[in-house]
Swiss-Prot record:
Protein name per Swiss-Prot or TrEMBL: Phosphoenolpyruvate carboxykinase (ATP)
Assembly with partners or alone: Monomer.
HAMAP family per the UniProt record, alphabetical: PEPCK_ATP
Ligand binding (Mn(2+)): 212, 231, 268
Assigned protein family: Belongs to the phosphoenolpyruvate carboxykinase (ATP) family.
Cited Gene3D superfamilies: 3.90.228.20, Phosphoenolpyruvate Carboxykinase, domain 1, Phosphoenolpyruvate Carboxykinase, domain 2
Cellular localisation: Cytoplasm
Organism: Salmonella paratyphi B (strain ATCC BAA-1250 / SPB7)
Gene Ontology CC: cytosol
Reactions this protein catalyses: oxaloacetate + ATP = phosphoenolpyruvate + ADP + CO2
CDD domains: PEPCK_ATP
Enzyme Commission numbers on file: 4.1.1.49
Binding-site list for ATP: 212, 231, 247-255, 296, 332, 448-449, 454
Residues annotated to bind substrate: 64, 206, 212, 332
Length: 539
């Protein structure tokens, strides 16, 4: 149903001229036909899988390009944004001049001019009073499919007279040949102008740039209004008890919040205001590497018609090899949230959170599977945002690579991290919420803590049995660990037990503690940050 009389003439206001045709808010059936059009070439063309979902490739860009992210520095942003060239903390918010912005905008509008375009109008944010109305403009059908999956789909009534607050122009096929003279990182770019309220994409086909681009914008707008903006998943129990799960990619946010006993609010991006927790999105973007029907049935069954697979290996018979990471370990699927049966309806929001869970995948094997945090430890570990990855080396030796990402999402923060911590703590205090640190990574055995044990730990947090358990303190990190929990092997609760000797743990723990201390140094330039040092490890 065409409910918005958008014409090529309207696009001239954006600098896009001579548009051949507009496919406005296409249906899933239309997108399916467009993506599988045999006349398409290269990364535009989709492949049908035996699961019913279309699969696409994003080329060399199988993840975001943080080094190619820029924000126009002007009167709107000069004094509010967390800039990469100011202060101690490193981030991806590189300043862009107005002159270079105009050049990039010209490249993208030229690329989109004279084309047949897909335009998707959608919402970012489930609360009507704080949501963004976003217009996505692309020449690629599957990119329109991606944003239709990931953002909140308006009703026909809401599309009448839709006025965008933000425009995303995706010119994936164009690059910037003048990047060197302009002092940029490469010919590719993901640029934002918060005054004009436009995002430009050039050179990268990765769909996640549109998703995380809008997250970065929400991360700018909401905390300035006192609303928490969070890189987390969220779900709600039968009694209305809400839990949020913070964590970097690969720590288990999507897996652990997709729980048959609880209704899903969302799997990645949320706000927390005076009414409670609400989703920014209308879909899920799940990792699929080594996905199995047995371990993650809800996600597996969500991969059907209207879902969109990215960078997976599709065999000649249409079956998908989820174990093959030859294109990338970051294989993904996007699907509308209603592909998960157990969701909050009709709007993805619920009350205030009472359980706040920080997920870390510690490849050093030092941190306990679970610990209960004090108020100061909550802020310390939120600002630290620690996880660690196992990276294979040429000789097959695996050494852990530590990652400290402020607020478990530094790549998407547009304000200083302490602003997010302050807003979160205020919301937690008002709701009487308790925080926990959960390690979904490794221990001294060299094996990853099983999903079965981690799920039992999450159950113990959510049903309150962990709060009633006896605890002991782990040296160096001063973390409160339960002595036993239902359904969890007691032996693994103390990470020292999983080593051949306590001295081995002590050696690794000392090395990790030093990394925490070095990382937190960047927050000690404020009295609030200095006061939190004592909540971290002590050597």
């Amino acid at each position: 149903m065409r409910v918005n009389n958008l014409t090529p003439q309207d696009l001239k206001a954006y600098g896009i001229n001579d548009v051949q045709d507009i496919v406005y808010n296409p249906s899933y059936d239309t997108l399916y036909q467009e993506e599988l059009n045999p006349g398409l070439e290269g990364y535009e063309r989709g492949v049908l899988t035996n699961l019913g979902a279309v699969a696409v490739d994003t080329g060399i860009f199988t993840g975001r390009s943080p080094k190619d992210k820029y924000i126009v520095r002007d009167d709107t942003t000069r004094d509010t944004l967390w800039w990469s060239d100011k202060g101690k903390g490193k981030n991806d918010n590189k300043p862009l001049s107005q002159e270079t912005w105009q050049h990039l905008k010209g490249l993208v509008t030229h690329q989109l001019s004279g084309k047949r375009l897909f335009i998707v109008d959608a919402f970012c944010g489930a609360n009507a009073d704080t949501r963004l109305s976003v217009r996505f403009i692309t020449e690629v059908a599957w990119q329109a499919h991606f944003v239709k999956n990931m953002f909140i789909r308006p009703t026909d009534e809401e599309l009448v007279g839709f006025k965008p607050d933000f425009i995303v122009m995706n010119g994936a096929k164009c690059t910037n040949p003048q990047w060197k003279e302009q002092g940029l990182n490469s010919e590719n770019f993901v640029a934002f102008n918060l005054t004009e309220r436009i995002q430009l994409i050039g050179g990268t086909w990765y769909g996640g740039e549109m998703k995380k681009g809008m997250f970065s914008v929400m991360n700018y707008l909401l905390p300035l209004k006192g609303i928490a903006s969070m890189h987390c998943s969220a779900n709600v129990g039968e009694k209305g008890d809400v839990a949020v799960f913070f964590g970097l990619s690969g720590t288990g946010k999507t897996t652990l919040s997709t729980d048959p006993k609880r209704r899903l609010i969302g799997d990645d991006e949320h706000g927390w205001d005076d009414d409670g927790v609400f989703n920014f999105e209308g879909g899920c973007y799940a990792k699929t590497i080594k996905l199995s029907k047995e371990a993650e049935p809800e996600i597996y069954h969500a991969i059907r018609r209207d879902a969109l697979l990215e960078n997976v290996t599709v065999r000649e018979d249409g079956t998908v090899d989820f174990d093959d990471g030859s294109k990338t370990e970051n294989t993904r699927v996007s699907y509308p949230i209603y592909h998960i049966d157990n969701i909050v309806k009709p709007v993805s929001k619920a009350g205030h959170a009472t359980k706040v869970i920080f997920l870390t995948a510690d490849a050093f094997g030092v941190l306990p599977p679970v610990s209960r945090l004090t108020a100061n430890q909550t802020q310390y570990h939120f600002l630290s945002g620690f996880t660690a990855k196992l990276a294979g080396t040429e000789r097959g030796v695996t050494e852990p690579t530590p990652t400290f990402s402020a607020c478990f999402g530094a790549a998407f923060l547009t304000l200083h991290p302490t602003q997010y911590a302050e807003v979160l703590v205020k919301r937690m205090q008002a709701a009487g919420a308790q925080a926990y640190l959960v390690n979904t990574g490794w221990n001294g055995t060299g094996k990853r803590i099983s999903i079965k044990d981690t799920r039992a730990i999450i159950d113990a947090i959510l049903n309150g049995s962990l709060d009633n358990a006896e605890t002991f303190r782990l040296p160096l990190f001063d973390l409160a660990i339960p002595t036993e929990l239902p359904g969890v092997d007691t032996h693994i609760l103390d990470p020292r037990n999983t080593y051949a000797s306590p001295e081995q743990w002590q050696e690794k723990a000392t090395a990790l503690a030093k990394l925490f201390i070095e990382n937190f140094e960047k927050y000690t330039d404020t009295p609030a940050g200095e006061a939190l040092v004592s909540a971290g490890p002590k050597l």
